[in-house]
């Protein structure tokens, strides 16, 4: 039982050392991630359309 208590005390200690982002930082990072995902979604969709068009042009 002492091992469990020691473990959870260690977890609590480490969680207190963790630096969490502010609301502004969290919002900024969320916008960056969502923007990047949308960019790559559009990029790969356009790439897929281009490859499909090229395939249809070459092979009918």
Swiss-Prot record:
It is found in: Cell membrane. GO terms for molecular function: protein transmembrane transporter activity. It is a single-pass membrane protein. GO terms for biological process: intracellular protein transmembrane transport; protein secretion; protein targeting; protein transport by the Sec complex. The chain crosses the membrane at residues 31-51. Its main location: membrane. One of its GO terms (cellular component) is plasma membrane. Keywords: Cell membrane, Membrane, Protein transport, Translocation, Transmembrane, Transmembrane helix, Transport. Pfam families: SecE. Essential subunit of the Sec protein translocation channel SecYEG. Clamps together the 2 halves of SecY. May contact the channel plug during translocation. NCBIfam families: secE_bact. Belongs to the SecE/SEC61-gamma family. Component of the Sec protein translocase complex. Heterotrimer consisting of SecY, SecE and SecG subunits. The heterotrimers can form oligomers, although 1 heterotrimer is thought to be able to translocate proteins. Interacts with the ribosome. Interacts with SecDF, and other proteins may be involved. Interacts with SecA. This is Protein translocase subunit SecE. It comes from Staphylococcus aureus (strain NCTC 8325 / PS 47).
